[in-house]
A protein has these predicted regions:
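Hydrophobic hinge/microswitch elements
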Residues: 117-130, 136, 183-250
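A late-sequence structural motif
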Residues: 94, 249-292
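Short helix-boundary/capping micro-motifs
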Residues: 1-20, 41
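Secondary-structure junction motif
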Residues: 136, 165-166, 172, 180-201, ...
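Interdomain hinge and pocket-entrance segments immediately C-terminal to HTH DNA-binding domains
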Residues: 42, 48, 72-91, 105-110, ...
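Central regulatory/effector-binding core of bacterial HTH transcription factors
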Residues: 79-142, 204
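A short LG(V/I)-centered, amphipathic sequence patch enriched
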Residues: 9, 29-46, 51
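Beta-alpha-beta core module
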Residues: 142-149, 153, 168, 175, ...
Length: 295
């Protein structure tokens, strides 16, 4: 309910009826002798005390999940469910190789993939909803994580084919000073990385931006339509540029801007050894991509 802020939506997400969920919340309020939620006709508002109870509940669930992990790991590694969270600017480009890896190397592993933005992934990891994340490092967030680097990749400048920079072998970063750089909407870590690169080059981009996209596929179509240029991770270039012949790509001169991709887990997880082996196997599966493996 705290996630959906609505009894009907929360009941549907938890596989129960709305009256049953409402009754359970009311019973908890009676047991504690305090109001935890404000009920309105449009949404549920968590009271300040309710937020504190919610924090305690999340810690209890996380501890329960850790206990389940420990029992599962003691039985046999790489068996049972594994909930993997992946950021949207990684999922379409690495999942094909990752899924093949899981099927061949870990046939008894029940992989569940969750594509979400970084803040949601980190919350899910801390709460025990997710086991391991595949995202840009450092992972950040308010809760500690154990980060396992996998590879570094460069960003590539993507332009319309008739752009003055199209066809050049490479460009310096300071070309960004004079370009209309299109960005993803707020909440994507790739947006923050692109903003940092532009600022390092001296470009003063507005935080809000006039044109924003929810995903990389839309972003490159905006570039193809002549609205500006953008920065793409090298792993996304072949997939996204292959959707249209109205794009050109230009490499940045060394040292090229880029990002580091890796795994993030909870510190002290009972499956730490599994995650390390998983990372090593994943590095081997990604060596054919345009990346620099981090051992």
């Amino acid at each position: 309910m705290a996630e959906h802020r609505h009894f009907r939506d929360a009941a549907a997400a938890s596989g129960t009826s709305q009256p049953a969920l409402s009754g359970a919340v009311a019973a908890l309020e009676d047991a504690l002798g305090a109001q935890l939620v404000e009920r309105t006709t449009r949404k549920v508002i968590i009271t300040p005390l309710g937020e504190r109870v919610l924090d305690h509940a999340r810690r209890v669930l996380s501890s329960l999940h850790a206990l389940t992990e420990e029992v599962e790991a003691a039985r046999r590694p790489f068996t049972g469910p594994l909930h993997l969270g992946v950021i949207p600017t990684v999922a379409p480009y690495l999942l094909p190789a990752l899924l093949r890896l899981v099927r061949t190397s870990y046939p008894d592993l029940e992989l569940h993939v969750h594509e979400e933005r970084t803040p949601s992934l980190l919350d899910g990891l801390a709460a025990g909803r997710l086991d391991v994340l595949l995202l840009a490092l450092p992972s950040g967030g308010s809760s500690p994580t154990r980060d396992i680097p996998l590879f570094d990749e460069d960003f590539v400048l993507v332009t319309p084919p008739g752009h003055p920079l199209a066809g050049r072998a490479s460009v310096p970063r300071d070309v960004l000073l004079d370009l209309d750089v299109l960005l993803l909407e707020e909440g994507h870590c790739l947006r923050d990385q692109a903003l940092d690169i532009c600022r390092e080059a001296g470009a003063d981009l507005p935080q809000g931006g006039s044109t924003r996209a929810a995903g990389l596929s839309t972003l490159v179509q905006l570039v193809a339509g002549g609205l500006g240029v953008t920065l793409l991770p090298a792993t996304a270039l072949d997939v996204e540029a292959g959707r249209t012949d109205r794009l050109a790509s230009v490499r940045f001169a060394d040292p090229a801007p880029g990002r580091r991709i890796g795994l993030a887990t909870r510190p002290g997880s009972a499956r730490t050894a599994e995650y390390d082996r998983f990372a090593a196997t994943l590095r081997d599966a990604l060596r054919e991509l345009p990346v620099r493996i981090v051992e």
